[in-house]
Amino acid sequence: MSAITQFTRFKSDKSEEMVKTAKAAKAIFEKHGAEFFRMSRFHTGAWAGEWLIVTRYASWEVYGKAQEAVAKDPAFAKLMAHIPSFAQLSGRSISVGVDL
């Protein structure tokens, strides 16, 4: 089964707020089926200074169910309303793993 991985990039100079918000988001996404939720920061290249959020799901089915559940979660809605006050979404990509 191929894993589904979502990569989301944010621009923000508010490191403490990014970390605090990512910790809250991690609990929400993992509660709803993400295998993991990770955050890192680019230090070189075209995206230097941007933040990267990575979530992984076991399959498209799990991904779909998780997205549906997250969309209905009041805690997630609260986070989504807060994020624009300190960060800007700059990109999102989804990759499908290849089982070797």
Predicted feature locations:
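Short S/T/G/P-rich N-terminal loop/turn motif that feeds into the first structured element of a domain
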Residues: M1-A77, H82-L100
